[in-house]
Amino acid sequence: MSTDEIYFNPIWDVRMTDTSLRDGSHHKRHQFTKDEVQAIVAALDAAGVPVIEVTHGDGLGGSSFNYGFSKTPEQELIKLAAETAKESKIAFLMLPGVGTKEDIKEAQSNGGSICRIATHCTEADVSIQHFGLARELGLETVGFLMMSHTIPPEKLAKQARIMADAGCQCVYVVDSAGALVLEGVADRVAALVAELGSDAQVGFHGHENLGLGVANSIEAVRAGAKQIDGSCRRFGAGAGNAPVEALIGVFDKIGVKTGIDFFDIADAAEEVVAPAMPAECLLDRNALIMGYSGVYSSFLKHAIRQSERYGVPAHQLLHRAGQRKLIGGQEDQLIDIALEIKREQETAKS
């Protein structure tokens, strides 16, 4: 699969994607309004952000009882984003089994031009038909290998090859839990670069659960990554994503060209994105436990909800979720864990 058709300005060293309006949806419990989306897209576009991702936190079709219902239908937000952006491309995420082929077609008709397809890092084969459709439709394609910390670099590279052969033009090492530490990122990115060569680019998506989102992104670029994700003001699941404004500041310092103006993106983060956030994304005990125990970042809000419902500590729920090696889509098992801890508490009292 050639990378010639990828949207990539020759002056860039890496292409940045802002995920505030997708990963940030987890933090906001999927309650974005049209006014918020329009304002954020306009600010990011003006700052020179090449790609802006817009969908429910769990991708196309994610609005559901299991994941949480959207305040505004995601397809309406994709259309609004595409109409608002003057230069930025609009990307959308889909997870096979959550979203459908028809969702991809509708997202494209609403102005989305980059289809990002995510699977668990050992299940790339479930994305084959979706990449095929996306390429048939003329969409640019990106693949997400989620929870990349759970398998070694050489196995991750084999999964990346499956995506690339199916039509994926850039495969991401996705640190869904914010659990990877420096060399762990570099080794995985380097393995993918060696495997894919010129067949596909390699990207990195980080979280701040151990406070390493920016540092890990730098490691990824130095290992050969050409696409990097972040969110303004860390607006994302868990402790949030690598903050775009900080990434741009650091990239400017070390000579990595992105085409994004540091001062404009800092203004966007402070004046436009921050007011749309229900609260700052914190590196608190819950987030740290997720990074330390390797828990999917979107579990945070679900764990807090079950903690309040059953009267058990959220950080204990998250730690046990890590011990059980739960992955995205298994959020409902937090209820079982909460009941288990509740029984243990009652037994200890008797």
Curated annotation (Swiss-Prot):
| Membrane-spanning parts | none
User: In what residue span(s) does the Pyruvate carboxyltransferase domain sit?
Assistant: 14-266
Q: Which UniProt keywords apply?
A: Aromatic hydrocarbons catabolism, Lyase, Manganese, Metal-binding
Q: Name one GO molecular function term.
A: 4-hydroxy-2-oxovalerate aldolase activity
Query: Which SUPFAM superfamilies does the protein's record reference?
Result: Aldolase (SSF51569), post-HMGL domain-like (SSF89000)
Q: Which HAMAP family match?
A: HOA
Under what name is this protein listed? 4-hydroxy-2-oxovalerate aldolase 3
The record lists the organism as: Mycolicibacterium vanbaalenii (strain DSM 7251 / JCM 13017 / BCRC 16820 / KCTC 9966 / NRRL B-24157 / PYR-1)
